[in-house]
Amino acid sequence: YKRQVRAVLSVSPGGREAQWPDQQAVSALAAASPFNTATATALPVFQLPARRPDVIHRLTLAGPAANYAWTINGALYDPRRGAVRQGQRVRLVFDNRSGMFHPMHLHGHTFQVLTDGSRQGPRKDTVLVPPHASVAVDFDADNPGQWLSHCHNVYHGEAGMMTVISYVD
């Protein structure tokens, strides 16, 4: 795939000329491998306390269908709400069955990415799910409401790849 590298240049009227970044450093960045969450971890202060999940929601990502539909669990905007209760540890398993990357986002919470299936990785609100791969994340249900989870490739979300996590009594 093609990689783009951008540099931010700060210039003010009458100031010194912009300093271009070191071309060797830019070339090294452009040739680097994509970020791998298996090697990243959160600082201990940001990790969720170790605990088994109380509920697991599997979100199967698929598409595009003949009409360019992107789905979660076989539905456009999956009407089956992912039910959670206040205080639960919730695991979302994003199972990508498509040939594209999907940056999956959850509103209202941050989650702990699980690497190697169980080791606590980085703390995020969006995780990149590679083609034909699964990524599991855990979050604590501590912000009641109805929270959208969707693909951050906007055209995938608009074409149906979204669902709602709902707190129930």
Outline where the language-model segments fall.
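Beta-strand signatures of extracellular beta-sandwich domains
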Residues: 103-105
